[in-house]
Amino acid sequence: MEPPQVPAEAPQPRASEDSPRPERTGWEEPDAQPQELPEKSPSPALSGSPRVPPLSLGYGAFRRLGSCSRELPSPSPSWAEQPRDGEAELEPWTASGEPAPASWAPVELQVDVRVKPVGAAGASRAPSPAPSTRFLTVPVPESPAFARRSAPTLQWLPRAPSPGSTWSRGSPLAANATESVSPAEGCMVPPGSPACRCRCREPGLTKEDDALLQRAGIDGKKLPRAITLIGLPQYMKSLRWALVVMAVLLAVCTVAVVALASRGGTKCQPCPQGWMWSQEQCYYLSEEAQDWEGSQAFCSAHHATLPLLSHTQDFLRKYRITKGSWVGARRGPEGWHWTDGVPLPYQLFPADSEDHPDFSCGGLEEGRLVALDCSSPRPWVCARETK
């Protein structure tokens, strides 16, 4: 590629009244008229070393708006292409008497672009079109020396080459800078950096989540909306917490049920059919009448005995048995005693036992113990402990 030729004066695009107008540089003559240069016209001689522009970035310079300097810097690869964290950065030129790059105001980038169309195939004899020269003025909103990391909120435009330009055609730095910015990801920092992972990652299922679902045989499209919104890991974490809360509530309910059951009142102890349950004992109230011996035999057949006042006094008082039913007391050679052989207390002796010495069986009348004839038929009560 031939080096671009520097025109005497190139037409500039018409700018609006609000946009700043670029000043004339030292290369332009006040009374010079625009003219077209031939294809192989020699470049004007400049004092000092020859100024060779970069092959891919063109020839241009940064100039502060409102600057009074008319001298353009000599382009060199050291400031035209400077890698910074995998991206191409341009180092601005500071004229004498101007502030440092850190305090620059908005600048203008003037670029001399020489476009030389590629001719037809070698076998074709058609002449190639003449090259055209364009002098472009591009306003830059911020100083190029301003580091990207110091202003993460600024949004950078994607560096895509325009048709007919030489951008990223021969410069590896420009190509790397274009590849490092992925518009699809919406992130202007390198894809592997933590800032991009935190800021550019969209909610939803990732590739790892899809792989896990496919391995488990679950279709990711049929999952609830909550999973697609917050992601599978966050959903599983919330599900685990819900299971923990449910387990705690279940344990509390189990403890409460056991405590209430243990503090319950009386336990239901079954008694034979026709028997009554009271105070941990079963009672049988007969509707027939028999002598004392027959009544005791009936109770013994049902693993019971005639009631003992020491154990059944409350029950007999509650039901007010006043028909003179038999009780488990009898007089023997050694005095009155219960059917289990325990002697009766003196205060429980029948009052009329001395008047009727032949009455040897005890009965209950009007709530008190009396001596009765053992052969007389009377109703009876059987008592036994629950099993």
Curated annotation (Swiss-Prot):
TM segment ranges: 241-261
Chain ranges of the C-type lectin domain: 278-383
One Pfam family recorded for the sequence: Lectin_C
Membrane topology: Single-pass membrane protein
This protein's UniProt keywords: Disulfide bond, Lectin, Membrane, Phosphoprotein, Transmembrane, Transmembrane helix
Basic and acidic residues: compositionally biased ranges: 15-27
Modified residues (Phosphoserine): 143
Family matches, as InterPro entries: C-type_lectin-like, C-type_lectin-like/link_sf, CTDL_fold, KLRG2, NKR-like_CTLD
Cellular location(s): Membrane
Disulfide bond residue pairs: 299-382, 361-374
GO molecular function ontology, one term from the record: carbohydrate binding
Region (Disordered): 1-105, 155-174
GO cellular component terms given for this protein: membrane
Main location: membrane
Gene3D superfamilies xrefs: Mannose-Binding Protein A, subunit A (3.10.100.10)
Protein name (database record): Killer cell lectin-like receptor subfamily G member 2
